[in-house]
Design a protein with these regions (language model features):
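Membrane-interface transmembrane helices that cradle and orient dolichyl/undecaprenyl
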Residues: 56-62, 98-114, 123-124, 148
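Membrane-interface alpha helices of multi-pass inner-membrane proteins
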Residues: 68-70, 113-128, 136-140
Length: 454
């Protein structure tokens, strides 16, 4: 159980996503990394299929459903997250399923739909805490339907039971942590915030990460999605009815409001739910324009086609354009082999091997029996490559950064060659770190640790 919880709190445990990933590990092709990356693509495929159905249900036109899914599929964040092992695409898969049930519940209120919606939202909570952002809207919808006597009052209790059933895996982990730590509130806080309470509850925009995340986020909108969405929002009440329009707009505002003030390095990845909601509004906008006249219908079809064709071309050309303009993009921590612009701007990753190249070179440098002290970013590539090529560097030890000095560690480090992936990693007590020299030769990828006064 503790392997699922980890050291960063329940909020980043994602237990159902881990179970989904374990299922994909049974695939008979590719290595572990390929299978888990493939799982992200499958999750996004489910979400896109749901989006097509959602847009069809909102507009009554199949071609709008297909066009909406295609436009969303080539958005930068969507494509980027579909190629790497991350949790967000599966959150989108469950979220779009929830939206299908929400529309059904509002248009044809039945207690079964309410329970199914709550159950699916509970499952999604076991995937990612982003599921909780739409929960207040669902609760308000249920209360309104009960107040209007379109649902029986006991449907609220049944829905609550459905949510608890869906989130049973996560709730079990909360109970386990509470019993282990002897503190229920600490377990609940871990489930809701993990170690990121100040960031989750942040009420202002952080400029530290805003610059590059804004640039990456804007790549999602090199199309006609925003003007189509604006038209859709203005026409949503007329096309969908005030109740459904209010619910969809409320979910959009909550998700977009959350991501704009969530100060984390990968802030742009949290845009995915907002992009889903924006494209649903865009589908309504397409319908509004298509209804005006034949000329408008042709024009909006052309806009949809451009929105599918142009983004990949822009992604491919952007690194070259940045190079020609002389703009320098550097990180505080430079990673060997990684072209930062190519890594972040181009969403397809089938030919991006910087992590693999680094791991191969690092393990070779640490031969025959060195110790590599790694941060979290480099740790898993090192371990995966070592497991894959188990005859290359079997005696090399890869250690995740641990700032807690342990008895005997200094003596072990004195007996073996020691390397760090970054020069600022503090892996020993300050008084001992002051007595080591960390340097890297020109052709090396790791920094060697040399004791100046053993």
């Amino acid at each position: 159980m503790w392997d699922y919880i980890g050291d960063y709190g329940l909020a980043v445990a994602h237990p159902l996503y881990i179970l989904i990933g374990q299922i994909f590990l049974f695939l008979p092709t590719g290595d572990m990394a390929f299978r888990l990356n493939f799982a992200s693509g499958v999750g996004m495929s489910i979400a896109l299929a749901n989006i097509a159905v959602l847009a069809f249900q909102l507009t009554g036109r199949q071609w709008i459903g297909i066009a909406t899914a295609l436009m969303l599929s080539v958005m930068h964040t969507v494509w980027w997250l579909s190629t790497i092992a991350e949790v967000y695409t599966w959150n989108a898969a469950f979220m779009t399923g929830e939206l299908l049930l929400l529309i059904h519940l509002i248009r044809a209120p039945k207690w079964q739909a309410a329970v199914a919606l709550a159950f699916l939202n509970g499952l999604n909570w076991s995937v990612h805490n982003l599921a909780l952002l739409a929960l207040p809207v669902y609760v308000v919808v249920l209360i309104v339907l009960v107040k209007k006597r379109k649902l029986p009052a006991w449907a609220l209790a049944a829905s609550a039971a459905g949510f608890v059933s869906g989130s049973a895996l996560y709730i079990i982990m909360i109970v386990f942590l509470a019993l282990k730590k002897g503190d229920l509130w600490r377990a609940i806080s871990s489930a809701l915030f993990g170690r990121y309470t100040s960031k989750v509850l942040n009420v202002q925009t952080s400029w530290h990460f805003l610059k590059h995340n804004t640039a990456l986020g804007l790549l999602n909108f090199v199309n006609f999605s925003v003007p189509l969405a604006v038209i859709g929002w203005f026409g949503m009440k007329r096309c969908l009815g005030g109740f459904l329009a209010a619910a969809l707009i409320a979910i959009t505002v909550i998700h977009f409001g959350f991501v704009t003030r969530y100060p984390v390095p990968d802030q742009f990845t949290f845009l995915l739910p907002s992009l889903v909601m924006i494209m649903l509004a865009a589908s309504v906008g397409v319908s509004v324009l298509a209804e005006r006249s034949k000329k408008w219908r042709i024009a909006v079809i052309f806009a949809c086609a451009v929105s599918v064709i142009m983004p990949p071309i822009i992604y491919a050309k952007t690194p070259k354009i940045i190079e020609l303009t002389g703009i320098k993009v550097k990180r505080e921590r430079q990673r060997p082999y990684r072209d930062e612009i190519r890594y972040w701007v181009i969403p397809w990753k089938h030919n991006e091997r910087s992590a693999e190249q680094f791991a191969e070179a690092a393990l070779k440098q640490a031969l025959p029996n060195g110790i590599i002290i790694s941060d979290l970013t480099a740790y898993y590539p090192l371990v995966l490559v070592q497991q894959r090529d188990n005859t290359t560097a079997p005696e090399v030890s890869v250690k995740l950064l641990d700032t807690n000095e342990k008895p005997g560690r200094k003596n072990i480090l004195l007996d073996r060659s020691v390397f760090v992936v970054l020069p600022d990693l503090k892996f020993l007590a300050p008084d001992i770190m002051a007595r080591v020299e960390i340097r890297r030769e020109k052709e090396e990828v790791l920094y060697s640790v040399k004791w100046t006064n053993p």
